[in-house]
Amino acid sequence: MVLSVSNKQGFINQSEQFEDRIIASEDTSNYKIVHKNDFAYNPARINVGSIARLTTIEMGIVSPMYICFRVRKGVVSEYLEHFFSTSYFFYEMQKRLEGSVRQCLSFESICNIPIYIPSSEEQHTIGKKISVLLDKIDIETHYHCKLVEQKHYLLRQMFI
C-alpha cells in the first residue's frame, strides 16, 4: 500500500490524500518500506507537522522523498511520537530548517535536537498518560459539539 504522511492524520493511504489524481509512480521499486512503529516525514513539510509513526498497518511504502527511521533500543516510539507534537520540538525544528523558499529539515538536523530520554519504564508511563489525556480531550470535544448541536436544535424548536 502506498502511503503519505498528512499533518492532521499521520500515515494515510495516498489515494485518500490525493483523491482526484494518481500521484504514485508506476515504478515503486525505489519507494521506501515502512514497518509498524517506523516514523516518516517529508523534509519540506515537517514545518507544518508532516511527521508520523505508522501504527495502523504492519507495512507500507512511501515516496523516496520521505525520510524514514525507527527508534533505537531504549527509546519508546510512543514517547518520541508525543515529543514531535510539542512546542519545544517545533521551536528546535524551526532553528534547524535549511533553505529560503522551501525550507527542509535533514535527518542529521532532526537527530541534533536535544531530547530528554528517561528510562524505558518512565517513557511508557509518560506516553500512556499523555495518550489518556489526549483521548479525554477528544471525548470532551465531541461532547461539547453534541451540546452545541442540542442547543441549536432547542433554540430552533423554541421559535417555530
Q: Which role fits each region the language model picked out?
A:
Residues 1-117:
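DNA target-recognition domains and sequence-specific DNA-contacting regions of bacterial/archaeal
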Residues 117-160:
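Amphipathic alpha-helical coiled-coil/heptad-repeat segments
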